Amino acid sequence: MTAKKSLTIFDHVLVPEHRVLSKEETEELLKKYNIKPSQLPQIKTSDPAVQALDAKPGDIIEIKRKSPTAGVYYYYRIVVED
């Protein structure tokens, strides 16, 4: 008998890597860019990536994107309620 492999949204080639920042990383990010959490782009709790990470409103998500010109760059979003 073969076991079925459980796939996640992150297994798809077009979905970039996501992760929830720790409290310390969040503080460093906000201090580095001299911003408030409300100044970050938003991502809703209904987003499949947010649900897969079990992120809560107020968490900051780091998205690692690949670019043919910039190489790898990071994008940050704050989780908000729908």
From Swiss-Prot:
Record key words, sorted: Cytoplasm, DNA-directed RNA polymerase, Nucleotidyltransferase, Transcription, Transferase
Pfam family, one: RNA_pol_Rpb5_C
InterPro entries listed in its UniProt record: Arch_Rpo5/euc_Rpb5, RNA_pol_subH/Rpb5_C, RNA_pol_subH/Rpb5_CS, RPB5-like_sf
PROSITE patterns: RNA_POL_H_23KD
SUPFAM superfamilies according to UniProt: RPB5-like RNA polymerase subunit (SSF55287)
Record GO terms (molecular function): DNA binding; DNA-directed RNA polymerase activity
Domain of life: Archaea
GO biological process, one term: tRNA transcription by RNA polymerase III
Catalyzed reactions: RNA(n) + a ribonucleoside 5'-triphosphate = RNA(n+1) + diphosphate
EC number: 2.7.7.6
Location of the protein in the cell: Cytoplasm
Coarse class of the protein's main subcellular location: cytoplasm
Keyword rRNA processing: no
One CC-aspect GO term: cytoplasm
Function in brief: DNA-dependent RNA polymerase (RNAP) catalyzes the transcription of DNA into RNA using the four ribonucleoside triphosphates as substrates.
Subunit structure: Part of the RNA polymerase complex.
Family indicated by similarity: Belongs to the archaeal Rpo5/eukaryotic RPB5 RNA polymerase subunit family.
HAMAP family reported in the protein's UniProt record: RNApol_Rpo5_RPB5
Name used for this protein in its record: DNA-directed RNA polymerase subunit Rpo5
Biological source species: Thermococcus sibiricus (strain DSM 12597 / MM 739)
